[in-house]
Amino acid sequence: MAVLEPELFEQHYFTIDDDKKPVKDATWAKSENKAYKEAVIADNGGKDCLSVSEYKACALVTKRLKNDFRGHISLEPAVKESSFYADDWYGDEDGVVNVKIRPDFFKPNLLGDVKSTKSPDPKGFYWEFFKYGYDIQLALYRQVLRDYGHTIDKTTILAVGNGAPYCHEWYTIPEDILEKGKEKYLYGLSRIVQIKNGNSSDKYGIGFRDEDDFIILDRY
């Protein structure tokens, strides 16, 4: 929210100083401190509570984005955090899959997502991008939005560091990567249909081995 809708941030979050803990040398998990924190949250209308360091980090990220012209181009104006439902979106007479997406933001010709990451730099985020299947996610988001009649020509990610110094970077996703992501989600959806219909018992892939070779799924 600090990134997408900073004007609403204060309405949903507040901060409490560690010095306010009844038991100073204990964490907030200690019963006395936990009870105090829950009471403060109730007094603040159920807002989410952030530590002072978390609150300052959010403020820093917001300030930096305000000074980044790419943020103004991408985020303002844009539709933010809206859900789209597509019933019977994939499948045939043998079975269908319903789809729900919730893109962080989009506008005419642009789809975008915000990702918290340990490594917002190009080398580090490249690894995380494929590890967590962001190519699959964004390819699916783009197709559903297009099915809703939205023109999406450019797909981008805002990668925000989740640790000091909380740097950020914008990345445009190439078309060939999105097409590969589409192949992956189509394959995944086809597997879901097969498993739902009982046409496949291969629910865990082609094999699995844990770190200690304790269990191996045999394929005959």
Map each language-model feature to its residues.
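Short histidine-centered catalytic/ligand-binding loop motif
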Residues: 46-49, 123-133
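Metal-dependent nuclease catalytic cores that hydrolyze phosphodiester bonds in DNA/RNA
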Residues: 1-100, 206-210
